[in-house]
Amino acid sequence: MTLTVRVIAPDKTVWDSPAEEVILPSTTGQLGILSGHAPLLTALETGVMRVRSGKEWLPIALMGGFAEVENNEVTILVNAAERGDRIDRAQAEASYAAAQTKLSQAEQSDSRQAKIQAVQELKRARARVQAAGGVVEI
């Protein structure tokens, strides 16, 4: 048996295909989903989900959201998402470097909001680099 996996962002459907396995970045850690999984509703962290279709793994950068698992259907509603095979790795790495610089600057300021925004921007940039196949320091 396979899973029906849908990744839906406000502006588009990022993925809608069968898969054998899904690994999600839940707020409590990595969560693996196989056929026959118990019903589940979970919040998702900004990070990389992985979808196994056949022998291939496809990474998808998720920018937070929710996942529902029921009757071998995995529905993922996210703020934004991007398939790893469609991310320009060099651009993603440049965005990650810029986000690191922005975080360093924010840590020097007194603005709590600037720090929070910089951390979120760094998480998004890290997810994009990882989905594109790059390696980043954590």
From Swiss-Prot:
Domain of life: Bacteria
Subcellular location, record wording: Cellular thylakoid membrane
One Pfam family this sequence matches: ATP-synt_DE_N
Ion transport as UniProt keyword: yes
Keywords noted in UniProt: ATP synthesis, CF(1), Hydrogen ion transport, Ion transport, Membrane, Thylakoid, Transport
Lipid bilayer topology: Peripheral membrane protein
GO terms for cellular component: plasma membrane-derived thylakoid membrane; proton-transporting ATP synthase complex
GO MF term set: ATP binding; proton-transporting ATP synthase activity, rotational mechanism
Task of the protein: Produces ATP from ADP in the presence of a proton gradient across the membrane.
Entry similarity comment: Belongs to the ATPase epsilon chain family.
Subunit structure: F-type ATPases have 2 components, CF(1) - the catalytic core - and CF(0) - the membrane proton channel. CF(1) has five subunits: alpha(3), beta(3), gamma(1), delta(1), epsilon(1). CF(0) has three main subunits: a, b and c.
Protein name: ATP synthase epsilon chain
Natural source organism: Cyanothece sp. (strain PCC 7425 / ATCC 29141)
Lineage: Bacteria, Bacillati, Cyanobacteriota, Cyanophyceae, Gomontiellales
This protein's encoding gene: atpC
